[in-house]
Amino acid sequence: MSNQDLINNKSKAGLTYAKAGVNIDMGNAMVEKIKPFIRATKRAGADAEIGGFGGLFDLKAAGFTDPILVAANDGVGTKLKIAIEVGHHNTVGIDLVAMCVNDLLVQGAEPLFFLDYFATGKLDPEQGAAIVSGIAEGCKQSGAALIGGETAEMPGMYAEGDYDLAGFAVGACERSMLLPSKNLTEGDIILGLSASGIHSNGFSLVRRIIEQNDLKWNDPAPFDPSNNLGVALLTPTRIYVKSLLPIMRKYEGVKALAHITGGGFLENIPRVIPSSLCAEINLSTINVPSVFSWIAKQGKIEETEMLRTFNCGIGMIIIVGQHTAEAVTQALEKNGETVTPLGILTKRQDQNKGILYRGVLHL
């Protein structure tokens, strides 16, 4: 055998990054697929072009004069397992953006830009493009530019077909408009904005109920016969930015917001009110969506557990002054929101209780 033959054989047997499970060409193919989605998120301050080592944003071009930057990051949780098993990937990106930008909104901030982290064991460009299309849609719904992200192909880290997502959002608020306000007081009105569904919390419990009842994702949804179970549960998280931000800027009486995520009312409302006040909530006023009634019944879940795990139909809380409540309610309804008067702020009697429930959930 000649020396050249030895070299050729050695070359054929040699390892490559692709043979180790990381295909750079696949990554490049995905980038080409997602560029149109990303360009569609262009806004003042960002050109929504990718490819640099860092994403750029011109804060001055966004029109702020004395801004405070606000940052948030989050994920989608085990709702992703349903998307993976159903093969429906184009809405979980909306969830990812929603979980971040709704948190920015609570501080009074306008979402400016978003970055994502997508990790998988083996990159499928079609799957990846579907995911990023959802992220771009969430960015459009919230007015944020998608200025960058990371796609990580990590063989051996994830089971076949599995992936995980994380999102990072940055917004800005004029210093004088930061929330919560320092003038929250007894008698302030608590309003609730309807959720679009389960949103992105509690899915480990939902999946356990599905398993215990031997249900299949393509079964008709018991709470929504027009959809199969998997698609119905994947209804994306509602993004409240475009309906709520103009109202927050117009009415000084908007004093605080709370994004109802993991922990429900109990964990989230006390985070935005002073320790001297208590949020008194009348549960009987909530029009509980049928999906939550179904979950409670199938899982034999008590009301207290439902309230600390799920949003139970209310995705965002707004606390407003008494004299502003009617005008804010009408403005929100005009912007397409369903508003529920939930209660009032009262003087806290027990220092360990920032929330007091009245009535019962109609599950």
From Swiss-Prot:
Disulfide bonds: none
Record keywords: ATP-binding, Cytoplasm, Ligase, Nucleotide-binding, Purine biosynthesis
Superkingdom, taxonomy of origin: Bacteria
Gene Ontology molecular function, alphabetical: ATP binding; phosphoribosylamine-glycine ligase activity; phosphoribosylformylglycinamidine cyclo-ligase activity
Statement: the UniProt record of this protein carries the keyword Transport: no
Pathway(s) this gene product operates in, as recorded in its UniProt entry: Purine metabolism; IMP biosynthesis via de novo pathway; 5-amino-1-(5-phospho-D-ribosyl)imidazole from N(2)-formyl-N(1)-(5-phospho-D-ribosyl)glycinamide: step 2/2
Compartments where found: Cytoplasm
E.C. number(s) listed in UniProt: 6.3.3.1
Family: Belongs to the AIR synthase family.
Name of this protein: Phosphoribosylformylglycinamidine cyclo-ligase
Organism: Bartonella tribocorum (strain CIP 105476 / IBS 506)
